């Protein structure tokens, strides 16, 4: 392993790929393309209102969500960083309804890039933390124009995944299947420098992240789990927990990699037609890859995330990840037979969060 003293992202990737079987030059090149896109986005977010990036443009993305100006600018940064380099065969993004192939006159690589160009965009106007999430998959039909079916692969097929975090400093965190490593952007040099080698998720922690305003819509296992945590020292867990919620998935992933804990965005009955809220292909799957590489766990509650195969580009799933002990406890509660829900409130299953 290279020393952390001023090791750049490019140097790190060259060293990592040198010990692997096969030619990883396209993977190395595509990761550097993604890093370049993230540098561009970092600069735009840092400029804020001075660059005219705040506010919404009146359009919606394929999921019906309002698109911020910076959503579209970030998406374009990914496209421009990858379209002419010959490292990718095609792209899929939260902000694009269909997959994007490149003109025949451009060189095509053998890898597919999927991404959420700007996670947590509701934080933009309040100068809150935002980020980017990405995943790299093999192209099943090298040399051909990419189709939607080419992208619908299980998380086990990922060859790399990671995120950028645009906070007080900009960080780029990734895995290529040999651990999770974090790099901090040196704004003077313009390079990502290795600062967090071999990041691991501690098996137990006293923090959890969930949007408690949805508690009345939670499934019984989630209610039971959160009730255990809120009971504190006098409850079954025999310790106090703190709740965190940043409204940016990337920020919660980063905190858990550094401090442990658990993140829950479960399925609920608020919108019963949705299986979950977060997208499998370019949010849940890359997070799952990072978590497993760092010694954590990731699940829907009933299924291991990396085993899922998306049925569509923008398929949604429940997402629960973090310290292994905590995630396993949630999985155990989902496996237990459901308690009978009595019609009479006096005998109904109760929790600390009331309906």
Swiss-Prot record:
CDD domains with a match to the protein in the record: FBPase
GO CC terms in record: cytosol
InterPro entries for the chain: FBPase_C_dom, FBPase_class-1, FBPase_N, FBPtase, Fructose_bisphosphatase_AS
Needed co-factor(s): Mg(2+)
Annotated binding of Mg(2+) 2, by residue: 116, 119, 283
Pathway(s) the chain acts in: Carbohydrate biosynthesis; Calvin cycle
Cofactor note: Binds 2 magnesium ions per subunit.
Example GO biological process: gluconeogenesis
EC number of this enzyme: 3.1.3.11
Compartment(s) of residence: Cytoplasm
Binding, substrate: 119-122, 211, 263-265
Gene3D superfamilies: 3.40.190.80, Fructose-1,6-Bisphosphatase, subunit A, domain 1
Binding positions for Mg(2+) 1 per the UniProt entry: 94, 116, 118
One GO MF term: fructose 1,6-bisphosphate 1-phosphatase activity
UniProt keyword annotations, A-Z: Calvin cycle, Carbohydrate metabolism, Cytoplasm, Hydrolase, Magnesium, Metal-binding
Catalytic activity: beta-D-fructose 1,6-bisphosphate + H2O = beta-D-fructose 6-phosphate + phosphate
UniProt similarity note: Belongs to the FBPase class 1 family.
PANTHER family: FRUCTOSE-1,6-BISPHOSPHATASE-RELATED, SEDOHEPTULOSE-1,7-BISPHOSPHATASE, CHLOROPLASTIC
Assembly notes: Homotetramer.
Protein name: Fructose-1,6-bisphosphatase class 1
């Amino acid at each position: 392993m290279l020393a952390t003293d001023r090791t750049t992202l490019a140097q790190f990737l060259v060293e990592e790929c040198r010990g692997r079987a096969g030619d990883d030059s396209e993977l190395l090149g595509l990761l550097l393309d993604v890093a370049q896109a993230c540098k561009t986005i970092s600069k735009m977010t840092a400029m804020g209102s001075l660059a005219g990036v705040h506010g919404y443009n009146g359009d919606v993305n394929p999921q019906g969500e309002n698109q911020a100006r910076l959503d579209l600018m970030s998406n374009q940064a990914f496209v421009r960083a990858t379209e002419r380099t010959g490292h990718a065969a095609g792209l899929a993004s939260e902000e694009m309804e269909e997959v994007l192939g490149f003109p025949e006159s451009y060189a095509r690589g053998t890898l597919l890039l999927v991404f959420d160009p700007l996670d947590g965009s509701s934080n933009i106007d309040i100068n809150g933390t935002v980020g980017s999430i990405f995943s790299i998959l093999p192209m099943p039909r090298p040399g051909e124009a990419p189709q939607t079916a080419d992208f619908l692969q299980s998380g086990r097929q990922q060859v790399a995944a990671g995120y950028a975090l645009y906070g007080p400093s900009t960080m780029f965190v990734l895995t290529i299947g040999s651990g999770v490593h974090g790099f901090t952007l040196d704004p003077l040099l313009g390079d990502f420098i290795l600062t967090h080698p071999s990041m691991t998720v501690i098996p137990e922690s006293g923090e959890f992240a969930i949007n408690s305003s949805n508690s009345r819509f939670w499934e019984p296992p989630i209610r039971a789990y959160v009730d255990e945590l809120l009971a504190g020292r006098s409850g079954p867990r025999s310790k106090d927990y703190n709740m965190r919620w940043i409204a940016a998935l990337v920020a919660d992933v980063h905190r858990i990699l550094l401090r442990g804990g658990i993140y829950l965005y479960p399925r609920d009955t608020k919108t019963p037609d949705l299986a979950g809220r977060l997208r499998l292909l370019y949010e849940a799957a890359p997070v799952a890859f990072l978590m497993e590489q760092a010694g954590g766990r990731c699940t829907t509650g009933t299924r291991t995330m990396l085993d899922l195969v998306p049925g569509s580009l923008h398929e949604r799933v429940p997402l629960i990840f973090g310290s292994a002990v905590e995630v396993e406890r949630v999985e155990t509660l989902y496996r237990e037979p459901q308690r009978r829900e009595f019609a009479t409130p006096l005998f109904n299953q109760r929790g600390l969060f009331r309906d």
